[in-house]
Amino acid sequence: MTQAWWRDACQPLDNAAMDQARARQQQLTKPAGSLGQLEALAIQLAGLQGLERPTLDQVAITIFAGDHGVVEEGISAYPQAVTGQMLCNFVGGGAAISVLARQLQASLDVVDLGTIDAQLELPGVRHLRLGTGTANFARQPAMTENQLQAALQAGRDSAQRGAEQGAQLFIGGEMGIGNTTAAAALASVLLGCPASELSGPGTGLDNAGVQHKAEVIERALRLHGLRAEDPLQVLGCVGGFEIAALVGAYIGCAQAGVAVLVDGFICSVAALVAVRLNPQCRAWLLFAHQGAEPGHKTLLAALQAEPLLALGLRLGEGSGAALAVPLLRLACALHGQMATFAEAAVADRPA
């Protein structure tokens, strides 16, 4: 392993398993291609798992949480105290992702990377405390070098825990008041797009609030003079603890050979950073949905991603990815359990 571990090689896809899965799809009792994207998903999962007939029984969900200093600029409709309160809700079973995890029989891990409440102690939460939230990136870099490295490593550790526990699919979620502002700032630099095209309502800003949010981002980017060619510096300067942890988790999963289902806008920004740092990890990323944040469509296009759902979601927490899990499971079930023409004694199409 190199010191910059995120540059280390990711696991290769199993091309032989993909070829076998592709051949199987041609023999199932249906017109070729008639299940559309579900067929491609089954074939991709075959390559990721190294199995002709992949399954998705073991799903690991990790929520990364952290507060954001840029909230001082009045860019959120909610107070920062909500971040810590939602951690309690996650482990208490009352949050959307908590309900979804139960329904999916998925594991749910909650990681506190640094909220404004330095004394917060909740059973069932991993408290790492890299700081009481990031610094206000409208005035100074969001993270120190040590904080950035620790956040990346926290994500990698979560990926490794998932792999050790036999996870076949990893979902990263996030919680942090102000994190759509950090995500929009990151995307603005990496995509070369004006912040006004990427800034949305987040947790419920009105039009004036969205405009103010974009202005705060533009002012911060002028202050820091960031370049897309240095994604790590961009992440440390305007990102968040939880976004950096997602980056580390996505790369860590690809290095460990665990498929990732990416959630919404913030998670897609983390995926973009991960791919810029290690392009090999892109093959391990599946994209769950196109959300309501205006910048999400632009991000997905930049990642050449085909989202599975479009439900107008903007909750975060990994909720959109969790909602897409049944679709992936059904794709695997159809691929693995449908009869072939020979097995069902059904006439195949003429050669």
Curated annotation (Swiss-Prot):
Transmembrane segments: none annotated. InterPro entries: Nict_dMeBzImd_PRibTrfase, Nict_dMeBzImd_PRibTrfase_bact, Nict_dMeBzImd_PRibTrfase_N, Nict_dMeBzImd_PRibTrfase_sf. Keywords: Cobalamin biosynthesis, Glycosyltransferase, Transferase. GO terms for molecular function: nicotinate-nucleotide-dimethylbenzimidazole phosphoribosyltransferase activity. One of its GO terms (biological process) is cobalamin biosynthetic process. Its EC number is 2.4.2.21. Pathway: Nucleoside biosynthesis; alpha-ribazole biosynthesis; alpha-ribazole from 5,6-dimethylbenzimidazole: step 1/2. The keyword Glycoprotein does not apply. It catalyses: 5,6-dimethylbenzimidazole + nicotinate beta-D-ribonucleotide = alpha-ribazole 5'-phosphate + nicotinate + H(+). The keyword Transferase applies. It is an enzyme of class 2 (transferase). The active site is at residue 317. Catalyzes the synthesis of alpha-ribazole-5'-phosphate from nicotinate mononucleotide (NAMN) and 5,6-dimethylbenzimidazole (DMB). Belongs to the CobT family. This is Nicotinate-nucleotide--dimethylbenzimidazole phosphoribosyltransferase. It comes from Pseudomonas putida (strain ATCC 700007 / DSM 6899 / JCM 31910 / BCRC 17059 / LMG 24140 / F1). The gene is cobT.
